[in-house]
Amino acid sequence: MKLAFILDPLDSIKIGKDSSYAMMREAAVRHHQLYTLQQNDLAWKDHQVIGFARPLTLLDPPEGDHRWYEEGAIEEIPLSGFDAVLMRKDPPFDTEYIYSTYLLELAERQGAYVVNSPRGIRDHNEKLAITEFPRFTPPSLVTSQEQLILEFLAEHEDIILKPLDGMGGAGIFRIQNTDHNIGVIIETLTRYGTRTIMAQRFLPEIREGDKRILLIAGRPVDYALARIPKPGETRGNLAAGGTGVARPLSARDREIAEELGQILYARGLMLVGLDVIGNHLTEINVTSPTGMREISDQTGTNVAGLMIDALEQNIARKNR
């Protein structure tokens, strides 16, 4: 197979924990051809969507985060010329990201197979998407109005505020009704009422970990990655200093995953990361879900292998 990965700059990838690297490594073991692009390598030219792609060879063994690959010369290739195009660009989900999804959707119409679906990515903001599944979510509020946030705080006394377009725990604040800088935090996050944010009731179960549950082709991986906050921190994100511990799915984890899995897969979302704190769904990650390496290293489950298995099966069905 000929696979194209749309990624952040390769030198920014930490191969010891990066899920895109895990998938590329698994694909290389199976002798699939690898190509990489960045977001700005996509173009509409001569009535088709093309990519300025570089052939990628993975070094075996890798020699660290900055010496694990070799790239060939740039090739101009229609996206329909790949067996699959995997969109793995990290947020922020800004206007450039949106434009990329439009180009990728055009490529789909020309026969390209894009994972995850560009429309699916665009339609599922990673914070807002949980509002479709209220029976699994904590009390939540989406607004730019300070008064509504203050009323929500008065009701729940201890809440989390987060931007709708962040990642890795960036811009997340916990506030309690006894704090003295509440107004400043709200003004900063909402940019004086001009930016919509999400508020959620604080879940003390975060101390036991913010669980990342991976869905592959609608089915949950048997282990979640519980991201445990460092002392004094309320964010479990690994980027915020959390520690990842693989754990078997609980009955509630599986209930959430199995209900959402087939719904999201039917929308073209083949690889999804659900974030669950305690018994509550807090986010649905569809851009570039992570956690494969940590789960695989700790449990022996080849998560990237499950993903490439599913990808091969879907490509075979598409080509029949």
From Swiss-Prot:
Gene (UniProt): gshB
Record bears the keyword Cell inner membrane: no
Record-linked PROSITE patterns: ATP_GRASP
Cofactor(s) recorded in Swiss-Prot or TrEMBL: Mg(2+); Mn(2+)
HAMAP family: GSH_S
Classification via Pfam families: GSH-S_ATP (PF02955), GSH-S_N (PF02951)
Keywords: ATP-binding, Glutathione biosynthesis, Ligase, Magnesium, Manganese, Metal-binding, Nucleotide-binding
Domain ATP-grasp: 127-312
Swiss-Prot/TrEMBL catalytic activity: gamma-L-glutamyl-L-cysteine + glycine + ATP = glutathione + ADP + phosphate + H(+)
Note on cofactor: Binds 1 Mg(2+) or Mn(2+) ion per subunit.
A Gene Ontology molecular function term of the record: glutathione synthase activity
Name used for this protein in its record: Glutathione synthetase
A GO cellular component entry from the record: cytoplasm
Residues binding ATP: 153-209
EC identifiers of the protein: 6.3.2.3
Pathway: Sulfur metabolism; glutathione biosynthesis; glutathione from L-cysteine and L-glutamate: step 2/2
Enzyme category, top tier: ligase
Residues that bind Mg(2+): 283, 285
Homology family: Belongs to the prokaryotic GSH synthase family.
